[in-house]
Amino acid sequence: QTYAHKALTGRAYTYIDPERYGEASGFANPDESEHDLFAMGHTSTSVSLGCGLAHARDLAGDAYNVITIIGDGSLSGGLAFEGFNNAAELDSNLIIIVNDNDQSIAENHGGLYRNLAELRASNGTCERNVFRAMGLDYRYLDAGNDVLALVDALQELRDIDHPIVLHVSTAKGKGFEPAQSDPERWHHVGPFDMATGRKLCPGHPSEPAPRTYADITGEALSAAIERDPQVVGITAATPYIMGFTPELRAAAGKQFVDVGIAEEHAVTFATALARSGAKPVFGVYGTFLQRAYDELWHDLCLNDAPATILVFGASIFGTTSETHLSFFDISMLGGLPNMHYLAPACMEEYLSMLSWSLDHREHPVAIRVPGIGLVSRPDLAPAEDTDYSAVRYNVVRQGRDVAVLALGDFFELGERVANRLAAEYGIEATLVNPRYATELDREFLDSLAAEHRV
């Protein structure tokens, strides 16, 4: 939806000119264009923003249209319901377009979507209507991909004097057969072969895409689910970041739960599972975990529930939009009681921490999943019985005078720094893998300070 808006407001170049790919950010950004009213990229916000715009218009005595668009997948977010509920209180123009393609990022989940299916099947005439139940007027358009039909519908509604939902049925990926036949895989893609649809390795177009932390997460959790009926994987509409393909989700059955775009519910759901003896693992992008801060504090950590949270994408790489950056995760989780936040430096360490967290029954555990590509370092592999409940930094290389502490994704950079100090300056630095993002090994740090100058 944002891409079409950007193309129509002077930024088509970012999609059609190879020399200018990436110049525009992935989401709405007022710094790019006066036509972008808000910086936004997290879902379910549009109806609440529309309510605010409409109320401000009315306070100023103006009479323009306010039109807001929300996808059916975004309806699973709690903020969407808050917006619809308050929109019904307006007594002036507000047009809410619900773009319903019967798909979130993966498939939709939740009872709401049964009613949307009934509305589509009845051409909008079904007596049960969630939008009318919230006090909103309603229109249905079956031909949502027909531009002229959509224009006619909007012309009909443009002067309406009260809030109304225009429910349009569309096809995700319309016009590109591979995307229509596999909408989940094509929701977000990198380079691919146009003829075959095969994903390509950036910089090496003839090679298949490399394995990722998502792949090994899916493999490890699937094996754990098969061994232990108490292990439960949880996602908030992004199962692919945990490596859970449709096949793995089907095999897991009730041991894998997609709650929709509802991070708050996911955290509180995991809290109750953990307190009831289950072993929940919630995989989530760091940028979206921010939405559940109160639940992290009030539900998970205050109750000291031994759930595992896998935090993906926690850094500043891999995006051109500040809405999807995630560099507040350490400060956010570091202020919570009872929480262990681990930061592995490689695949071996990550799998060790994940395995330990499944059987750890004392406190909540979060793991900062590396994001710079799958790194295998057998030399850093922890012992099988490593207990991460006691904060102990790992000295990878003992040196003198200078100490380099390199956490998680920064470990290889720290290692290169230590190697360069040795090669160019003859300084044998101590190289440390801290492993804990928010807890200090105070005894070790005191000894380090006593024995090193820098």
Regions found by a protein language model. Name each.
Residues D152-L154, H187, T212-E226, G243-A250, ...:
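Glycine-/acidic-rich phosphate or pyrophosphate-binding loops and their flanking alpha/beta elements
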Residues T43-I69, S74-V130, G135, L148-D161:
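Hydrophobic, small-residue-rich alpha-helical packing segments that form membrane-like cores
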Residues L8, F176-Q290, E295-A305, E384-R392, ...:
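Non-catalytic terminal/interface segments that mediate subunit docking, oligomerization
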Residues P30, H55, L59-N65, G110-A153, ...:
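Conserved thiamine diphosphate
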Residues A12-A24, A88-A106, C301-A314, M332:
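A glycine-rich helix N-cap at a beta->alpha junction
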Residues Q1-L90, V231, T245-P246:
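Cofactor-binding active-site loop characterized by glycine-rich and histidine/acidic residues
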